[in-house]
Amino acid sequence: MACCDERRTPALVRPGHRWSRGEVLHWLENDLPDDTLVGFDMSMSFAFDDAKAYFPGWTEGPSGARALWALVETVCADEPHLGATTFADHPQAAPHFRRHGGREGALFGGGRGRFRQTEHAQARAGCRPYSNFNLVGAAQVGKGSLAGMRLLHRLQHRFAIWRSHAAEISASAA
């Protein structure tokens, strides 16, 4: 992790330290300077617009980002280190993921999987994005996203998280 302000280049918070997810969460909850813009290198939700649902067919599935984060946290509550393997193996969620061992769920969408609007924009720009429903290989982006959703669920009352809190004003934001 690094911090910077308008006068300096980024500086590591604890140079040489290997942060655990729990340590990152603790620092963000307790030591984050006021009026800070926080950036995360992860996706904050899954594809929704294409099917008007994160998990089509899951009648009690989440209908928005905060509900998604809460669901991931609830299903994975017993996993240490903000892990999220339990969610990918959940009977209602598993059909939507490509998982290790050649297990591609029937609702993964084939190819590179279902895309959010941002992946569609990347493809139009000439990039080769992959779905965050992909949990295997070098192109997997979903594992970090799921862990990040647990982090966001726990931080949502600490500061505003764009876009799900777009209209709210806070001293800090992510």
Spans of model-derived segments:
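RNase H-like (RuvC/DEDD) metal-dependent nuclease/polynucleotide-processing core
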Residues: 1-174
